[in-house]
């Protein structure tokens, strides 16, 4: 009998060691220590998004989609998009992800669902201004 191990791809737009360590620890805790972590990182994506003020219609969006496809090519069973500033790119490829059979999950999705469930008015605090609009859009979407 073949040993089946979960492969989770973590897609980062930052190479902050503390963030990577924290996320990998939490993912391992939630999916098991025998899971394989695929870590894909491109800090130029977030740098470009910060400079432009948004992710849509940028080369950064194309590179991020390329990272999702690289995760699929490496055999990922699921992809976790770590950056809220680019979460709408993950949203935009959900139909393709369904066809491929590899879900792309936003790190902030459940937080937004819970905020929408619990409150009539939701405040958003962020470390980057580029996170505000995508997060507000996600809260509005999941509240419907």
Segments (PLM) and residue ranges:
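Non-catalytic structural scaffold of enzyme domains
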Residues: 1-144
């Amino acid at each position: 009998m073949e040993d089946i191990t979960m492969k989770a791809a973590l897609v980062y737009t930052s190479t902050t060691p503390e963030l990577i360590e924290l996320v990998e620890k939490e993912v391992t805790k939630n999916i098991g220590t025998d899971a394989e972590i695929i870590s894909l990182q491109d800090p130029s994506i977030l740098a470009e998004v910060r400079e432009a003020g948004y992710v849509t219609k940028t080369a950064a969006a194309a590179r991020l989609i390329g990272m999702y496809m690289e995760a699929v090519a490496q055999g990922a069973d699921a992809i976790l998009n770590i950056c809220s500033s680019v979460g709408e790119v993950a949203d935009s490829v959900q139909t393709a992800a369904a066809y491929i059979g590899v879900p792309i999950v936003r790190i902030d999705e459940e937080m937004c669902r819970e905020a929408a469930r619990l409150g009539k008015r939701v405040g958003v605090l962020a470390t980057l201004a580029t996170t505000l609009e995508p997060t507000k859009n996600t809260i509005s979407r999941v509240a419907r």
